[in-house]
Design a protein with these regions (language model features):
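A glycine-rich, aromatic-flanked flexible loop/lid motif
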Residues: 172-173, 212-223, 238-250
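Short, hydrophobic/aromatic alpha-helical segments in well-folded domains
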Residues: 182-185, 198, 241, 248
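Glycine- and acidic
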Residues: 68, 181-187, 228-232, 256-261
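Flexible secondary-structure boundary motifs
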Residues: 198-236
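Charged, non-catalytic interaction/linker regions at domain boundaries
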Residues: 1-194, 201, 266-268, 273, ...
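Charged/polar positions within long, soluble alpha-helices
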Residues: 211, 250-258, 280-291
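Short, surface-exposed helix-loop/turn micro-motifs enriched in polar/charged residues
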Residues: 191-195, 214-215, 260-263
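Histidine-centered, metal-coordinating catalytic motifs and their short helical/loop contexts
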Residues: 235-265
Length: 331
């Protein structure tokens, strides 16, 4: 809770700033009779702060982000980026569907109330009403779910560090950040077509070090290889789903549209689930790569992915174990 003394001091500082803005406006020729007096400036600032605090009290939760010392405008921007990425990580861990309505308070949302009218062949008008609620969102026991995913939460959460405390990131770390953002953008995108393309982009950013011809089968193969290695393909359907997903993505990029609502619904579900599973597996896969090869670049990532296709994951696990011993301060 914000202390009253802090609020009073903030009102005093912001009032002085507003009065100064009024003086500068008058100096530049703005009519004085149309500006605020000092008392009006004070009332304006108080009212603005009061309404904002009241709105905050109604929020189910509030994010508090501390950014390392830097320019105020940049630090504010980074705080927003960090909060958005934190929400994206929650979306990855809990799934796209139950977290679709989780958003920042000022983010754009759909209409809360809508209506639909249509007439049948007999001229009878049928009406329907729709009301959306932003609460509750996610799952009831979301905290417990996140705690159970402790390893993935730690690794994916590490993507927040270079945002609030600018440090040099590894190549794989930047790829993970990009993929998380692609996934989050896909979840919140109201357009099904662009959402599917973004889900695929998240996977491509994770598993491809370079562009190659014939990517459709290569894409499906890499998704299958990684998910199979982490026991996430028990029904042996990942390859077929990934193949169909990439074909759908290519068709959409070239202007094709879905013919039915069911078709788009099925495609978006496959895209979100495959992208989510790839991110969760990559949290562990990337950790192994970093332990084995320190900071693999594009070429090394491509080499590793091809070797996983040929030999599976055991060799990388062994290399990661050796890397941990090699770089350990205790020998």
């Amino acid at each position: 809770m914000i202390k009253k003394s802090v609020l009073k001091h903030s009102i005093h500082v912001n009032t002085k700033a507003h009065i100064q803005c009024v003086k500068e406006a008058i100096a530049q020729g703005f009519p004085q009779e149309r500006t605020h007096t000092k008392d009006e400036s004070r009332q304006l600032v108080r009212k603005l702060q009061s309404r904002a605090v009241k709105a905050y009290k109604d929020y189910p939760w509030i994010a508090c982000v501390k950014v390392s010392e830097c320019d105020e405008a940049i630090s504010k921007e980074r705080a927003i980026q960090a909060t958005e990425m934190a929400l994206h990580i929650i979306r990855i861990l809990l799934g796209a569907k139950p977290t679709r309505e989780i958003r920042l308070a000022w983010s754009r949302s759909g209409a809360l109330r809508s209506a639909h009218l249509h007439a049948d062949v007999h001229g009878v008008i049928h009406a329907s009403l729709c009301a959306d609620s932003l609460e509750p969102v996610g799952v009831i026991n979301w905290h417990e779910v996140l705690i159970r995913a402790n390893l993935e939460l730690d690794i994916l959460g590490s993507a927040l560090i270079p945002i609030v405390n600018p440090v040099e990131t590894t190549h794989l770390h930047q790829r993970l950040i990009d993929a998380i953002n692609w996934f989050g953008d896909a979840v919140t995108d109201s357009n099904v077509h662009s959402s599917i393309v973004k889900y695929v982009s998240a996977i491509e950013r994770l598993f491809f070090g370079k562009f190659e011809a014939g990517r459709t089968k290569l894409f499906a193969g890499r998704v299958r290889d990684v998910l199979k290695a982490f026991n996430c393909d028990e029904e042996h359907r990942v390859y077929t789903k990934a193949l169909e997903l990439y074909k759908t993505r290519s068709a959409l990029v070239h202007g094709e549209q879905f013919r039915t609502e069911d078709e788009s619904f099925n495609s978006i579900n496959i895209a979100s689930e495959l992208s989510r599973m790839c991110l969760l597996c990559s949290a562990q896969l990337y950790s192994m790569m970093l332990q084995a090869f320190e900071n693999p670049n594009n070429a090394k990532l491509e080499e590793i992915m091809k070797r996983i296709n040929d030999e599976g994951l055991n060799w990388l696990a062994e290399a990661a174990a050796l890397g941990c011993v090699k770089h350990s301060p205790i020998r």
